[in-house]
């Protein structure tokens, strides 16, 4: 058994949290994760006052009547679980130098991300984007293994999904021109950047499926890291032929070892399956017992790192808006690549 770090230390002086948004991700992940880690939620605001009041009554915190009332809170961390096009306006209203967690994506496109970055710079906000996959126990353990040299130099990274995602759960997706990469595979692209650094570019194709009207649910992408590192993603959310051959896996190979990851939440969503991490350093595959899962443990780890940065316990903010902007640039490049023609075959002479 390999003993690897799987959690982020909690802040010594945790700050209360004010949440914007009372949607399903807040109900199912943010609130349960924060309370399980003994963070205090001071209050919540949502334009749907009934939803906000129901959560406030259930958990014993305040439901603010207006966004302005929520934004006026002092000495808190603001958690923006809001639609991407709403982020910038809320950020403009927050106190100078506030600590903020912004729901991914960082805007609906790169222009939106650039506006969010401008606001955060202008108001000196200590803002991170909620790319919480980096903070999943299995990914923290993988990061620890890589940092300790167990895999050597990482030279191959494969992300392979063949799942049956219930897109109908999210009514707001109907009519959106960008779905799969912007709202799902963005997690994988961000995590890949955290391991391999920034690619030189990307070749990508994203498309929908004849069975539904969601704009894009399948993606193939190759990230260009030069002549030494290979990175490819094959993403299919329409594999509706039973569990037997479905998969949600990362295979990461280095010059000394390899890692296999099974991302359980995407299989039988939203119930999911347990995550799996196995590592092979030359003597066979060894399972790493995991003490939590992507959903919901990563949300508490993500909040803990932000709070430790804001309170001066850590010098670096992971997935801050400066770094997250580059993930958005990669997403934008993938969509631009998909819209561009591929290299054509030569005509037969």
Residue ranges and their predicted role:
Residues 133-213, 341:
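Predominantly a Rossmann-like dinucleotide-binding segment in NAD(P)-dependent oxidoreductases
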Residues 1-14, 77-80, 226, 305-349:
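C-terminal helix-rich "cap/oligomerization" subdomain common to oxidoreductases
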Residues 102-103, 127-129, 158, 261:
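Hydrophobic residues in well-ordered beta-strands that form the structural core
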Residues 118-126, 140-154, 251-254:
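Basic phosphate/pyrophosphate-binding loop/patch that engages nucleotide-derived ligands
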